[in-house]
Structures are given as structure tokens and as C-alpha cells.
From Swiss-Prot:
GO cellular component terms given for this protein: cytoplasm
Cofactor note: Binds 1 [4Fe-4S] cluster per subunit.
Reaction(s) catalysed (UniProt annotation): iminosuccinate + dihydroxyacetone phosphate = quinolinate + phosphate + 2 H2O + H(+)
Cofactor: [4Fe-4S] cluster
Pfam family, one: NadA
Keywords carried by this UniProt record: 4Fe-4S, Cytoplasm, Iron, Iron-sulfur, Metal-binding, Pyridine nucleotide biosynthesis, Transferase
EC numbers for this chain: 2.5.1.72
Family: Belongs to the quinolinate synthase family. Type 2 subfamily.
NCBIfam families listed in its UniProt record: nadA (TIGR00550), PRK09375.1-2 (NF006878), PRK09375.1-4 (NF006879)
Binding site for iminosuccinate: H25, S42, Y113, V114, N115, S130, H198, P199, E200, T215
Known role: Catalyzes the condensation of iminoaspartate with dihydroxyacetone phosphate to form quinolinate.
Protein name: Quinolinate synthase
Binding-site list for [4Fe-4S] cluster: C87, C172, C260
Length: 302
């Protein structure tokens, strides 16, 4: 048995001993995904954090995801195995900046992408993910919407509403790098393959896609599509799930440079050590958590 398998067995034993739940994002390393109780997108993981039984949640993702789990499951211990796994986009808007934006646009609703800090969620009216951004925006009674922090997701949602969407100027370092040239090269290499991209991509890339969806939406599309070849425009970690769950389908990365270094920081050693030590533990101050919980709860209630 190799070192990876030994570590995985040790983690599974510790998980049972500690009554822990292991959640992993679709962008995590394959060997981490393989031992998770659930691998999914941000919306699926948020719902799981709120509903799953257990004393401890080990969140294999980045910091804002673990914060969201701590907000939704205040009675559980939430661990983030790689303490330095952050999301640069989440740092592109602060609570203070959002308060100023509200003052500049009185009467506008604030929709925050889940890729934000707890403090920003606390200043927002409702949260969204890439899977439900359109329905969240359309659920609001206000006719103007401040959308933070991802400009690309905000502009994508604006295509499907009559509301005036005011997007922030944030972006995902991975998805914003895709260009129309990347699409052209991939289609030349794989003629006939459907192009499926994440809504965090630039508008000019989205315009060239056959389908646009969240990570789990991409998986469902590949599973149900009659086609057999797909060009996947999101972080390459999703290819592991696609290879396991879509037998007979061939999936190619839109760019092999689409790697989120922060999502890859979590290793099996980190997971094992977190279960042994009960650290690093993620907590959110009650005053912020209660306000952020309202914004997340409104999303989950849709």
C-alpha cells in the first residue's frame, strides 16, 4: 500500500473516531476528493454544512468556505486544514467599501457572491453562488442591485434580468485569465467538442461557449449531454470528478494553466493533522455571524 492510501486510511479512521464530516470543493486535489463525504460546489457544500450530522466539519477548500460553514453550523467545530488557503477575489471587497457603496446607491439591494468574507456577507441583503446568481437577483423587489465582488458573474446575471446590476470590479484569478484565443485553440485541438465554461469567465469567453454553469452544473451537463467530448472552462480539479462520474465522456481543459494554487494547498497530511490536533479552527464573531447568517439563509430559502 502506498503512502497516499495509508494516509487516506488513517484519515478515515480519525474521521470516524472524531465524528467528523469531510467536505471538499470540486477544485481540491484528487486524493482529497476521494475521501470526502461530499465533494461539490459552493452551494452544495453550504447546504451540507447546515444539514449534516457530526461534531466536526473538516472543510477542504478556502477560507471563506470554512467561514460559511461556521456561520451555518455554529454548534460544530469547523476546521480548515490549510490555514493559508485563501481566495484573492474575496479580498477584493471589504465591509467598509460595501457600506460606502450602499451610501452611493441608496435603495439598491446588495447581492454578495459566496466568495466573500463573513464581514461582507453581514453587510449584504442576500448571498448567492454561481449556481443560483440569476435566481437570487431576480428574487429581489429592488430594481437596482449592487453585485459584489465578481464583475464577470455580475455581468452574466445581468443578461437574465430587467434589473440594473451594478457589478463590483473583482474577479477570479483563474477564470478571468481565459481568452477567446484559448477557446479557439481548444476547438482547433478538439473539433466537435462542446465548450462548457464557468460564469466567472469574461463575457467574451462566455459568448463563445455552448453552455455556462457552476462546477456541479458542468458535471450534470456532461452527464446528460448526448455529446461525447467537452472542453471544460474552469479550474482543472473538476476533471477528476468528471473522469469518475462521466464514463465514456472525454473532457479536456480549456487551458492546462487553470490552476487555483489556494485550492491545491490542502494535502492529505494537512487533513490528517487537522483531525489529530483540532486545528486550525475557524470561528466567526457572533455579531457578524448572525447578520451574515441572514444573508446566507435568504439564499438557501429560495
Amino acid at each position: 500500500m502506498d503512502d497516499t492510501a495509508l494516509l487516506q486510511e488513517e484519515i478515515l479512521r480519525l474521521k470516524e473516531k472524531k465524528n467528523a464530516i469531510l467536505l471538499a470543493h470540486n477544485y481540491q486535489r484528487p486524493e482529497v476528493q476521494d475521501i470526502a463525504d461530499l465533494t461539490g460546489d459552493s452551494l452544495e457544500l453550504a447546504r451540507a454544512a447546515a444539514a449534516m450530522q457530526g461534531d466536526t466539519i473538516v472543510f477542504c477548500g478556502v477560507d471563506f468556505m470554512a467561514e460559511t460553514a461556521a456561520i451555518l453550523a455554529p454548534d460544530k467545530t469547523v476546521l480548515l486544514p490549510a490555514a493559508d488557503a485563501c481566495c484573492p477575489m474575496a479580498e477584493m471587497v471589504t465591509a467598509e467599501e460595501l457600506r460606502f457603496a450602499r451610501a452611493r446607491h441608496p435603495g439598491a439591494a446588495v447581492v454578495c457572491y459566496v466568495n466573500t468574507t463573513a464581514g461582507v456577507k453581514a453587510e449584504s441583503d442576500i448571498c448567492c453562488t454561481s449556481a443560483n446568481a440569476i435566481s437570487v437577483v431576480n428574487s429581489l423587489t429592488e430594481d437596482r442591485v449592487i453585485f459584489v465582488p465578481d464583475k464577470n458573474l455580475g455581468r452574466y446575471a445581468a443578461r437574465f434580468t430587467e434589473k440594473k446590476v451594478l457589478p463590483w470590479e473583482g474577479f477570479c484569478l483563474v477564470h478571468d485569465r481565459y481568452t477567446p484565443d484559448d477557446v479557439a485553440r481548444a476547438k482547433d485541438a478538439h473539433p466537435g467538442a462542446a465548450v462548457v465554461v464557468h460564469p466567472e469567465c469574461r463575457p467574451e469567453v462566455i459568448d463563445l461557449a455552448d453552455h455556462v454553469a457552476s462546477t456541479s452544473g458542468i458535471i450534470r451537463y456532461v452527464q446528460t449531454s448526448p455529446g461525447s467530448e467537452f472542453i471544460i472552462g474552469t479550474e482543472i480539479g473538476i476533471l477528476h470528478r468528471l473522469s469518475k462520474e462521466c464514463p465514456g465522456k472525454r473532457c479536456f481543459p480549456l487551458s492546462d494553466k487553470a490552476v487555483c494554487v489556494n485550492m491545491k494547498k490542502t494535502t492529505l497530511v494537512h487533513v490528517r493533522d487537522a483531525l489529530v490536533t483540532g486545528q486550525p479552527r475557524i470561528t466567526v464573531p457572533d455579531e457578524i455571524a448572525s447578520r451574515a447568517r441572514r444573508a446566507i439563509g435568504r439564499m438557501l430559502a429560495l
